[in-house]
From Swiss-Prot:
Its main location: membrane. Keywords: Cell inner membrane, Cell membrane, Electron transport, Flavoprotein, FMN, Heme, Iron, Membrane, Metal-binding, Transmembrane, Transmembrane helix, Transport. GO terms for biological process: protein repair. This is Protein-methionine-sulfoxide reductase heme-binding subunit MsrQ. Belongs to the MsrQ family. It comes from Citrobacter koseri (strain ATCC BAA-895 / CDC 4225-83 / SGSC4696). It is found in: Cell inner membrane. GO terms for cellular component: plasma membrane. It is a multi-pass membrane protein. Heterodimer of a catalytic subunit (MsrP) and a heme-binding subunit (MsrQ). It comes from the Bacteria. The keyword Ribonucleoprotein does not apply. The gene is msrQ. Part of the MsrPQ system that repairs oxidized periplasmic proteins containing methionine sulfoxide residues (Met-O), using respiratory chain electrons. Thus protects these proteins from oxidative-stress damage caused by reactive species of oxygen and chlorine generated by the host defense mechanisms. MsrPQ is essential for the maintenance of envelope integrity under bleach stress, rescuing a wide series of structurally unrelated periplasmic proteins from methionine oxidation.
Length: 206
């Protein structure tokens, strides 16, 4: 039984709640002292993990819609991508304002040099920014075939973001490994498309 348009609308409502509720919980935890002795790191990791969850959910939509024969599921992909960018922006903002401090933002360039994992994170954010700006139907019509080539760069984010997470933790724990493995599974699930994109991307880089 295929999902109806009305059910998709309700699904989008639930996805909006899934994007908003973690933020409300985080605000509550900060105000109630529900974080650890290093709340800045807690906030950074929480926002980053939530962004990763939405990234993985975005990557899951296309193969799930195809194999479950639910074409209307595709309509949730943009929403998930927007929430991914929103949480990635919160993640970047928490680092810039809470760790560096508003008076030390000029140090960001130096930080990118001394901490390469930050470079991977910044690259991922800029890609998500570009994908968000061009996520509308108007942008899709204007860009034509280039739109799909641009939005295939989400695959690069799916590679860089888990590496960024793995590299950033001082003590390796199962959680970043699980995210990395899930990203690999989702890329392998669309092996042909990913292989074509990778060959094109690698060819231009070399």
């Amino acid at each position: 039984m295929r999902l109806t348009q009305k059910q998709i609308v309700w699904l989008k409502v639930l996805l909006h709640l899934a994007g908003l509720l973690p933020f409300l919980w985080l605000v509550w935890a900060v105000n109630q002292g529900g974080l650890s002795a290093d709340p800045v790191k807690d906030i950074q990791h929480f926002t980053g993990r939530t962004a990763l969850k939405f990234l993985l959910a975005t990557l899951l939509v296309s193969p799930l819609a195809r194999y479950a024969k639910q074409p209307l599921l595709i309509r949730t992909r943009r929403l998930l991508g927007l929430w991914c960018f929103a949480w990635a922006t919160l993640h970047l903002t928490s680092y810039a304002l809470l760790e560096l401090g508003i008076n030390n933002l000029a140090l960001l360039g130096q930080e990118l040099i001394t901490r390469p994992y930050l470079t991977l994170g910044i690259i991922s954010w800029f890609i998500l920014f570009a994908l968000t700006l061009t996520s509308t139907q108007a942008a899709q019509r204007k860009l034509g075939k280039r739109w799909q080539r641009l939005h295939n760069f989400v695959y690069l984010v799916a590679i860089l973001a888990p590496i960024h997470y793995l590299w950033s933790v001082k003590i390796l724990s199962p959680q970043p490994v699980i995210y990395a493995l899930l990203a690999l599974v989702l890329l392998a699930w669309r092996y042909k498309t990913f292989r074509q994109w990778w060959r094109s991307f690698a060819g231009k880089m070399l």
